[in-house]
């Protein structure tokens, strides 16, 4: 019996190729054109996107990217490449490819890379610990489109999420403990997840439940009282209601109420990126301190730490 050759596809959101208005515009156009991300009527959305949002947002967002850009590219790309390389070293007999839903390298290039290695089974690991239709669902859709163009398709194992995975929770808990040891235990640990429109949850997306699961499991692993751990949602976009409470408004309220020391972690981000390094580590720090808070630390994403890579290796092993 022929032995199956398995490859691993690490999937994430994507990033502009450069911190320039032109590169950001190309990226945002692809990202915001996905119906999984914005499902507004195309007759209404196209003129707004092309005539208002892209011209106005691209220069401003490019400046934000420039403030966190690294020597090897955007933080998300640098850390994602490190994850890919570290996992390949951990699993030397298994090809590991990296693909992004938007921008480069594409999911299609990642699939082609694995097929060129003659794999007949691909384990797809979207690096979103908590499922959402707008992230994991988008990976599924694009993968289906890619494979629909192939005469021969490999077997596929698709990891929906890992919100309560034991190794993931332990890695988060150890990261929090290290931050507490370095900076002192805060008055409050705030867990900030990327938001989605409330309507998506109302229509069946179980993302908020998956975030609550991670929050509950992490608090339990840390043996922290429930009142010392708070869950919020960041990065809202547009005018319709998103999941609440909002991170920025919560930090302002906590500062005004006299909470002195806060540490913030973003458990939904497998790699640091614009939303963590600029929005959370910088913008929201200013919000909290400006409202009267005294001390604020951002706890970095797991990135390519050894515990994170070991978690990935153990996770994909169950699907090989």
UniProtKB/Swiss-Prot annotation:
GO terms for cellular component: cytoplasm. It catalyses: heme b + 2 H(+) = protoporphyrin IX + Fe(2+). Pathway: Porphyrin-containing compound metabolism; protoheme biosynthesis; protoheme from protoporphyrin-IX: step 1/1. Fe cation binds at residues 194, 275. Transmembrane segments: none annotated. It is found in: Cytoplasm. InterPro entries: Ferrochelatase, Ferrochelatase_AS, Ferrochelatase_C, Ferrochelatase_N. Its EC number is 4.98.1.1. GO terms for molecular function: ferrochelatase activity; metal ion binding. The keyword Iron applies. Belongs to the ferrochelatase family. Monomer. This is Ferrochelatase. It comes from Escherichia coli O127:H6 (strain E2348/69 / EPEC).
């Amino acid at each position: 019996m022929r032995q199956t050759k398995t490859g691993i596809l690490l999937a994430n959101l994507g990033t502009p190729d450069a911190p320039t208005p032109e590169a950001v515009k190309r990226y945002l156009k692809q990202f915001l054109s996905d119906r999984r991300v914005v499902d507004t009527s195309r007759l209404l959305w196209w003129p707004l996107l092309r005539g208002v949002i892209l011209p106005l947002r691209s220069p401003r967002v490019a400046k934000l990217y420039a403030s966190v850009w690294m020597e090897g590219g955007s933080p998300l790309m640098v850390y994602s490449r490190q994850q890919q390389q570290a996992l390949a070293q951990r699993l030397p007999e298994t090809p590991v490819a990296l693909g992004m839903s938007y921008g480069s390298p594409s999911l299609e290039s990642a699939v082609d890379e694995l097929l060129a290695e003659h794999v007949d089974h691909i384990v797809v690991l979207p690096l979103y610990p908590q499922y959402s239709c707008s992230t994991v669902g988008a990976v599924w859709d694009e993968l289906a489109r890619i494979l629909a163009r192939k005469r021969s398709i490999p077997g596929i194992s698709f990891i929906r999420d890992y919100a309560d995975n034991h190794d993931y929770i332990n890695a988060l808990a150890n990261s929090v403990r290290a931050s507490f040891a370095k900076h002192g235990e805060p008055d409050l640990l705030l867990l900030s997840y990327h938001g989605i429109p409330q309507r998506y949850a109302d229509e069946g997306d179980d993302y908020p439940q998956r975030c609550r699961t991670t929050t509950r499991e992490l608090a339990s692993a840390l043996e922290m009282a429930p009142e010392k751990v708070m869950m919020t949602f960041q990065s809202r976009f547009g005018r319709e209601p998103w999941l609440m409470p909002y991170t920025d408004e919560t930090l302002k309220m906590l500062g005004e109420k006299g909470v002195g020391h806060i540490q913030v972690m973003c458990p939904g981000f497998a790699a640091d990126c614009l939303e963590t390094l600029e929005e959370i580590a910088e913008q929201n720090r200013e919000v909290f301190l400006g409202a009267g808070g005294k001390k604020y630390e951002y706890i970095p994403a797991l990135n390519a730490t050894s515990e994170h890579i070991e978690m990935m290796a153990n996770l994909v092993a169950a699907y090989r």
